[in-house]
Amino acid sequence: MVMHAHAYPDIEIPTPSQIAAVALNNEPDENGEQSMVLSMGPQHPSTHGVLRLAVELNGENVVQLAPDVGFLHTGIEKTIETKTYTKSIVLTDRMDYLAPMSNNMVYVAAIEKLMQQDVPERAQTLRVLLLELTRINSHLVWLGTHALDLAAMSVFFYAMREREYILDIFEMLTGARMMTSYFRVGGLAWDIPADFIPTVEDFLTHFLPKVDEYEDLLTNNLLWKQRTKGVGVVNAADAIALGLSGANLRASGVDWDLRKTMPYSGYETYQFDVPVGQAGDIYDRYRCRVQEMRESVKIARQAIERVKQMHGQPYVTENRKVAPPPKSEITYSMESLIHHFKLWTEGFRPPRGSAYAAIESPRGEIGCYVVSDGTPKPWRVHFRAPSFINLQALPHIAKGKLMADLVALIASIDPVLGEVDR
């Protein structure tokens, strides 16, 4: 096999131990200047979780830094190996806890691919609707905390106000505000309530003008532009070399969104645009995510119209070896009772083999690789966590920048530490 060198630059990322060595062997240079090593976090509000940064400073300028992760390690991937495929869905919520349905989706999509299991059209449409509500929910948390980090406190309260509507919708549907565990292999856990669609429609009508309010407060704000424009620039070549995805990649001018390039769940049938930036700075990352919320509203409205036309269609597969039968059947069908008993005591058994699925989560490309040995429990499950990969770009972006800009840089990457450490 011939290995061809790629055209993208090799970027060196320092480790925390390398920066610690600087502190131990810190001697003044020929000009008498001496760097300082600072430990930022893990108990720091602007690291957006339990993230520690080992930072070498020369005055107020960042010489180099290294993320030190693992403080929130939960061993989710290993724990999944000890549970049946269905019982593990609840664990995926705990990774990116701001986008639990995206985690559910990529996990069940990998299993469905492994089993070659079809999903009813109505279930796919409802998945799209819920994934876009999840995207808006996640972006609202990002927008509010990002603005708060740069002292724009009002935006935080406005964003949290709208997020409450989405959490109420999730609670109406699943009984939980954050850890929803609603997706299942072959479809969804149960059908939507009668007032679900009208409630979502009311929210979308209410929400779209609020996005204009956020932009009125920030987009042309002189202080906001001074803190974000031209700061933390990543060009397209570096973004690809670093493995960035999501808005972090698109802000650098790379038009890559899995909903368009590798569509799933019927996304190829929806009309929407993919926001793409040019400068690759904090400001463009902000503009891309804000515009994504508008596009999510557009997709959600299309999904709602389709759901209205699919009334009465199934929300989960009728393959009783994968999905349990309705409870009404159990009372008169011995076969249904047996399927129900076997599914909840043993679980289904995918064939031996492996499968990889990827979707576009609010933070970028989240992937799931499932390996089956033919038993009811997976032999191995690995998640490609976009937060983990996007975070490795921080040393490259922050090098030479002011310490005051580091807080804005972290927020612009939008990491979730539950997903980083998992």
Curated annotation (Swiss-Prot):
Q: Which UniProt keywords apply?
A: Cell membrane, Membrane, NAD, Quinone, Translocase, Transport, Ubiquinone
EC class, as a word, reads translocase
Query: Could you say which EC number(s) this protein's record lists?
Result: 7.1.1.-
Gene3D superfamilies, per database record? Cytochrome-c3 Hydrogenase, chain B (1.10.645.10)
Q: Quote any Pfam family the record assigns.
A: Complex1_49kDa
Major localisation: membrane
GO terms for MF: NAD binding; NADH:ubiquinone reductase (non-electrogenic) activity; quinone binding
Any Gene Ontology CC annotation: plasma membrane
The UniProt entry lists membrane topology as:
Peripheral membrane protein
S-S bonds:
none
Compartment(s) where it occurs, according to its Swiss-Prot or TrEMBL record: Cell membrane
Catalyzed reaction equations: a quinone + NADH + 5 H(+)(in) = a quinol + NAD(+) + 4 H(+)(out)
What the entry lists under InterPro entries is as follows:
NADH_Q_OxRdtase_suD (IPR001135), NADH_UbQ_OxRdtase_49kDa_CS (IPR014029), NDH1_su_D/H (IPR022885), NiFe-Hase_large (IPR029014)
Give the family from UniProt: Belongs to the complex I 49 kDa subunit family.
PANTHER family documented for this protein: NADH DEHYDROGENASE [UBIQUINONE] IRON-SULFUR PROTEIN 2, MITOCHONDRIAL, NADH-UBIQUINONE OXIDOREDUCTASE 49 KDA SUBUNIT
Describe the subunit structure. Answer: NDH-1 is composed of 14 different subunits. Subunits NuoB, C, D, E, F, and G constitute the peripheral sector of the complex.
User: NCBIfam families in the record, alphabetically?
Assistant: NuoD, PRK06075.1
**Which HAMAP family does the UniProt record give?**
NDH1_NuoD (MF_01358)
The molecule here is called: NADH-quinone oxidoreductase subunit D 1
Gene name tied to this protein: nuoD1
